[in-house]
């Protein structure tokens, strides 16, 4: 007669233990809203964190905290001797998310891989014209010209045939624009005349399943119980959007979030002194820059661009925004840790008299006004956008140039910059794959000028030829020599003011474990948990 109460007591005890060790939700304070959830339509790191790193996977991936390419949805691959064919062998048993709006009937297979690339490659594909903005990253990277075909060999094998050798191809395949979608889900949406849901109700194979998005407030996910690398330790992931880095820090201290992305560099010492907090940091592959719209009056003249460059005090800018040791003044469009960095190039000295002379020679009337677009909140490449804009405004006033500062929400700024509405725009880039091509082709190529990702609207044939040749070279020494020449052309023609290469910081509560800061500035929380 005592057995039933004993069993009940044991059951209650087990339930108590289970409740006690239940995984806690992870709340991450992030700096901006994602542009959308159809990853291939967008290019920003904010969107990649909220979409590519949570919802989707790719054939290959980067080992956490490094730029080493490792298997992901493909568990192996073969490369032909001529370097023109890549055959990917897919991992078996990978499942797409089951949601209230999609119930997959099969595992991920070659049809999904082919669909994901053909949609971007083939103008006759039924989904190709449904993207209102095209496929900016795919196009800027030159993949339209690079990919000859993407073919299904069998259910678990896909063959990519290239038109030329491409040294960074495997690294490119690990990037956000190469995310793999469910062809079955896409077919379901097309038949139901709900194509827009691909961008609003995403489905992938990634560590987290999308639940809902409250614009400019938060994105909510739940852990994927079927994730091929194992269910994430956090039962839920919440991205809490706070554009002000001071607000993100306040929320972290109040335990309203357990991770705060991109704190201000000058807040780092006080964060490190707080017993309840800790900081992860490393040198990042970034560049912050001012792009000058070479399609606009006056800005099309290299003398004007040179004048603006030598009138602006970049050293003062870096010191004011980043503090000592947290960033270096940039010379070239990518940092010196990457292949082919040209160490022979230097910044010209600041020279207001020469700047005035160049402006006069170019016929720019004193008092001419240029617009400068900047964002309303700080991020990894620009922790204090308004201060930086005001410093430029003050410096250029000394040479007779007025700056009309236009502060706007991140997504709005990108949209208007892509449309070419700016004279200048304060922007930044974080390398996606550890290769110099990832800085030069997406932001400075002629193709990127056409689709608006090249905010300078700069298309230089000599520069284009050099970076095209470099991509096709396998020998690192030969590639490096070509990149050094490309940087010389860039500096001679001055489409940007290269501002800074930064150090990356992430602040978190002491009870957060399993987070890996990345030199690529991506944030993946598949292994992160709150203890």
For the regions a language model picked out, list residue spans one by one:
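Detector for C-terminal structural segments
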Residues: 24-30, 50, 167, 214, ...
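N-terminal lobe/hinge region of extracytoplasmic solute-binding protein
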Residues: 29-81, 118, 125, 201-205
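A structural "hinge/loop" feature
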Residues: 33-50, 73, 100-104, 167-179, ...
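Aromatic- and charge-enriched surface segment that lines or borders ligand/interaction sites
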Residues: 75-127, 159, 251, 298
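Surface-exposed binding/hinge segments that line
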Residues: 89, 112, 121-186
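Structural transition elements
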Residues: 208, 299, 328-362, 379-387
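A bilobed periplasmic-binding-protein/Venus flytrap-type ligand-binding module shared by bacterial periplasmic
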Residues: 222-225, 284-307, 311, 320, ...
